[in-house]
A protein has these predicted regions:
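Conserved active-site and cofactor/substrate-binding residues in soluble primary-metabolism enzymes
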Residues: 2, 6, 10, 97, ...
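A short, charged, Gly/Pro-tolerant segment at domain boundaries
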Residues: 271-283
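C-terminal active-site/capping subdomain that shapes the small-molecule cofactor and substrate pocket
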Residues: 189, 197-272
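Short, surface-exposed amphipathic charged segments that create phosphate/polyanion-binding patches used
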Residues: 35-39, 100-105, 162, 185-191, ...
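Short helix-capping/linker segments at secondary-structure and domain boundaries
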Residues: 16-19, 109-117, 169, 257-271
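Active-site phosphate/pyrophosphate-binding segments
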Residues: 109-201, 280-283
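A generic structural motif
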Residues: 21-26, 68, 170-181, 231-240
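Glycine-rich phosphate-binding loops that contact phosphosugars or nucleotide phosphates
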Residues: 1-127, 138, 198, 205-233
Length: 283
């Protein structure tokens, strides 16, 4: 849940066999699929309610289970029940900022080929990432960001959305092509009560491996929405591998969100509303 599933969500865009469960209990999938599955429970804090509930539900099954966490109740349960687990470094950072740790852990646990690629990546272009993020943040000033991507890059668009929410402290939304052409465009007709001209900024995550028709849809949608006063930016994914493209774009998202937080003098680390909600949930 939250920042703890982001690594899995990014991997899902490269591996269709990965399924992300965002709920309580075990996934509602056919038994023949469940019986061939490995359940990897990830909670950075180790105290995520939904993850702990699913762990307990899985104990009454014979399905193979593993856990990834920094500690908390999940680590205790894994140790008591002799469940294979990986303990992440507890550096005090937010789960969304621990993407690298979680990617290494999950790919190692699953013996995923991405694990070896991760070890070869460098941060030589980090300064250019910050500049790109700062530029996008400037264009989003006083506007609600709308993140747009292909369906294949849905996980990346979602990463952008939650990073802008949690680090940037702004509302942000995402959608994918071609689906958004069948509904979301209608929300920007002039004269609607919900549309304030000039109050949105769309960021298009463009991958040169996207289907040609998807790329055309993005381009036309960008033109149509600009006529409705929706400003926009295009971020072209770069890298020699899929995972490098994803992580580069994630890096830029972090810088964008950080600069947005600075614009409003918000604390990029703290998540007070989420913490307040959790306290009320436990009352």
């Amino acid at each position: 849940m939250g920042g703890s599933h982001l690594a899995g969500t990014l991997l899902q865009s490269m591996d269709e066999k990965i399924f992300i469960h965002h709920d309580y209990d075990t996934p509602r999938l056919p038994s023949e699929i469940l019986e061939k599955s490995i359940f990897v429970l990830v909670s950075y804090s180790g105290n995520t309610e939904e993850v702990l509930h699913t762990f307990q539900a899985l104990q009454s099954t014979s399905y193979p289970v593993a856990a990834i966490t920094t500690g908390g109740e999940l680590l205790k349960l894994a140790q008591v029940n002799e469940v294979p687990h990986i303990v992440l470094p507890n550096t005090g950072i937010q789960p969304r900022a621990a993407l690298g740790y979680q990617l290494r852990a999950i790919t190692h646990l699953l013996k995923h080929p991405t694990y070896d690629i991760l070890g070869t990546l460098t941060s030589q272009e980090a300064l250019s990432f910050e500049a790109q993020g700062a530029n996008l943040a400037e264009q989003c000033l006083n506007k609600t960001p709308l993140i747009c991507s292909s369906g294949e890059n849905r996980g990346l668009a979602y990463y952008w959305k939650i990073t802008l929410n949690e680090t940037g402290k702004v509302p942000a939304f995402f959608n994918t092509f071609p689906e958004c052409n069948h509904n979301e465009l209608s929300g920007f007709n002039t004269g609607t009560n919900f549309n304030t001209p000039g109050s949105y900024h769309a960021i298009y995550l463009v991958d040169d491996t996207d289907h040609a028709r998807i790329q055309k849809r993005m381009h036309i949608s960008q033109q149509v929405l600009e006529e409705k006063d929706v400003t926009s930016s295009t971020l072209k994914l770069t890298g020699s591998s899929k995972i490098e493209k994803l992580l580069t774009a994630c890096h830029i998202a972090q810088w964008c969100a950080l600069h947005i937080a600075e614009q409003t003098q918000a604390d990029p680390e703290a998540v007070p509303l989420i913490e307040t909600f959790k306290r009320k949930l436990n009352d």
